[in-house]
């Protein structure tokens, strides 16, 4: 049976099962603010752990860093964010709604089912002309009466210290990358790494988006998983292709359906002025294709900017050739919230069972599941033995314990939150030290000795 996956179903499951709640809900919420609940925080942490494992732990090239969110204002001047990090905005003269011009065009073309990829890189005049020519209406009131397009800086501004003046002005970082670039020399010096090498970081970023939406896909506060991979100029396109393929295979290895993924190459007019090549790995959400991962060849732009603005020498001296150069940088940048949402959508399933029964199941890769197993005593009289098994397994995995309701209803609850294995403690357990372990996806059951549980589950959840 083909299941219709809608955002309404995903949002309802996320809220009802403790994955994601609306932020500040008891005060009426805050637009596009979301809190990860008890299951959501485990799930998202598992996504981050999987990325760190493959991009840092198992990589002979890469090291980690955790840079500060608040940085010297000059960092953002050097990077170009103070002067150029902006969205093209228009105001509706009828209802005063503020709209992103490029998104108006992209949504209009998507509704027409036209083969249109992006309005990135268009000038203000091109955007306005297209909107006027096609009589694109305001999504809020339906009228076509817009102001001219103008740029709006996306950075959140605040002040450090007791005075609010230009000298104390700082920003919440709009990306994690700059914290890596300014620590390039520190990492080279302390790790004694040679080219090529990379620096990875997971952290929060903030952008004052005008049109956030689609649940956790586009929010003003979000988490990034970024790698800045430095290499010798001339080898950059080779490494660009390497990290593009590595990133693609990472998603497939965690179970995302290949049919729901695509690689979109940026056209020349879309490229950032510093970029030599950029591709996006996109996922087919219920609301359409959306970017998960951007892989860009940033050349030596960032290191050169920071070297020029700071006056510090950021060149690399090759110890084997004595050649001195500014490394080029390949950046695979992944949104943690976006890819977590993609895993949720992809895993969601509804299954018709024999006897007219049905179930909702999250077919998450076991490495990503919030709980790796659930301990289910057949009756409450078996609680002591069940808690003994729980205590043993919880030293190795995050496991659930549930003794409320029929065993069938407990199976359904665990299916819906993605628990790959349910372990039932029954009266035979007291006699022969064995338990029944049920597979989430196939619903097959086998009998296994308690002493073998850790090994069995470890092999199944390995990634």
UniProtKB/Swiss-Prot annotation:
Binding site for ATP: 207-209, 217-222, 291-292, 335-338
GO cellular component, one term: cytoplasm
Binding site for substrate: 100, 175, 222-226, 331-335
Main localisation: cytoplasm
E.C. code: 6.1.1.14
Catalytic activity: tRNA(Gly) + glycine + ATP = glycyl-tRNA(Gly) + AMP + diphosphate
One Gene Ontology term of the molecular function aspect: protein dimerization activity
InterPro entries xref list: aa-tRNA-synt_IIb, aa-tRNA-synth_II, aa-tRNA-synth_II/BPL/LPL, Anticodon-bd, Anticodon-bd_dom_sf, Gly-tRNA_synthase/POLG2, Gly_tRNA_ligase_bac, GlyRS-like_core
Record keywords, A-Z: Aminoacyl-tRNA synthetase, ATP-binding, Cytoplasm, Ligase, Nucleotide-binding, Protein biosynthesis
Protein location: Cytoplasm
Coiled coil region boundaries: none
Single Gene Ontology BP annotation: glycyl-tRNA aminoacylation
Disulphide bond pairs: none
Record bears the keyword Transmembrane helix: no
Function: Catalyzes the attachment of glycine to tRNA(Gly).
Subunit structure: Homodimer.
Similarity-based family: Belongs to the class-II aminoacyl-tRNA synthetase family.
UniProt-recorded name of the protein: Glycine--tRNA ligase
Organism: Clostridium tetani (strain Massachusetts / E88)
